[in-house]
Amino acid sequence: MTELDSLWEAIQNSFRQDTTPVTFDTLIAPAKAISLSQNQLEIEVPTPVHRDFWRKNLNTQLKEFAQRELGRNIEPHYVLEGEFTYTNKKTEDDPTPSFEMDTPLNPHYNFGTFVVGEGNKMAHAAAFAVAESPGSLYNPLFIYGGVGLGKTHLMEAIGNHMLQVNPNSRVKYVTSEDFTNDYINAIRNNTTEQLREEYRNLDLLLIDDIQFLANKEGTQLEFFNTFNALHDRKKQIVMTSDRIPNEIPELQDRLVSRFRWGLTVEITPPDLETRIAILRSKVEEDHIDIGNDTLNYIAGQIDTNIRELEGALTKVQAFANLSGERITPSLASQALKGLHRVAKNEISIATIQKQVADFYNITQGDILGKKRVKQIVMPRQIAMYLSRELTDSSLPKIGNEFGGKDHTTVLHAIDKIETELKKDTDLQNDITKLKAKLRS
């Protein structure tokens, strides 16, 4: 086996263990190693989407892995199938071929610019599978989660990918409010047949914030018939919502039933590693000079959603520009100070105790009590940790709120959770979800 074959086999095996089967099969396995020189690994990928995904999500891991395996620095170089980099002078920085769009999709919302993490990897894999084979795998695809977590990005990425593969595809992106207005205007102008012609002959319908169809009986009926017409013709439907179908109030049972025909996937708030990766991607894209220590600090302060995370980065940039100072963790702390004082004051220790108890299916009395069973001790320690993180309370104050416990008990709980967070991804996700609930 050659050095190239050995390296590539090891790389593929490593990525296979670290990603979901769908992500590996659709985005990683199709790539091929073409050549290996002293300091460059040339990798062939089938589409620009694959190329962008490797660059954004796998590049750093690949270089670190190659360094360990070969003992030298290797720079990955990505080429499209049939693209000969040295004879036709194309480079990996060539722009993605343009395509015509007759639908208002944001071209920035593509799979290459989507940062994959623990909280969104299933949704990302499902979205890419749908984009590769619309109408056949998961139809409909229903993506749900909180505000600012990337649902619209993934939805529009499906549309952009489909138009890139086939510019003649009939793709339509609308919010549920747009659909409602189209329906009302069609009734008012006696153009319902034109409306149905427009919507029921699509190849892909993307409808955002479907929960706002609640309480609109006429619109729900029209969408029900549109859904059936598209699904019967094996045309893809993708929807987003802030909750699962059966939790949308006043949504007709027949719609709930049809929304469940395909696949429902959740996007949760990004964990710390994903937040750092999102910030790093943003500063690289915007050519901003910010050190990793500062990015790590910002990512540690904002754990609600991506919009607030990028907003915090913008605030730090503005603070630096106005003050004329270099961006450092200290400056970032000053820039974000007011933001977190407001957030902390809105959350009480009692609220934290109740949310943690509900999350782990125990009682608030268990949190305040003295039982030492693991199922109660860990949630109690988490509640103490969050009380320190999300309020301005002192250790003695927190101890008093937890049934009169000593401040050293609180300190031990905080240290315990901080230690576990460094190695326990399940705990990281639990903490992220709890913080999101408490701040929502």
Curated annotation (Swiss-Prot):
- What Gene3D superfamilies does this protein map onto? 1.10.1750.10, 1.10.8.60, 3.30.300.180, P-loop containing nucleotide triphosphate hydrolases
Compartments it resides in = Cytoplasm
A Pfam family: Bac_DnaA_C
Provide the binding site for ATP: 148, 150-152
Decide whether keyword Cell inner membrane is in the record: no
Purpose of the protein: Plays an essential role in the initiation and regulation of chromosomal replication. ATP-DnaA binds to the origin of replication (oriC) to initiate formation of the DNA replication initiation complex once per cell cycle. Binds the DnaA box (a 9 base pair repeat at the origin) and separates the double-stranded (ds)DNA. Forms a right-handed helical filament on oriC DNA; dsDNA binds to the exterior of the filament while single-stranded (ss)DNA is stabiized in the filament's interior.
Q: What does the comment on domains in this protein's record state? A: Domain I is involved in oligomerization and binding regulators, domain II is flexibile and of varying length in different bacteria, domain III forms the AAA+ region, while domain IV binds dsDNA.
What the entry lists under NCBIfam families is as follows: DnaA (TIGR00362)
Record protein name field: Chromosomal replication initiator protein DnaA
Q: Which organism is it from?
A: Limosilactobacillus reuteri (strain DSM 20016)
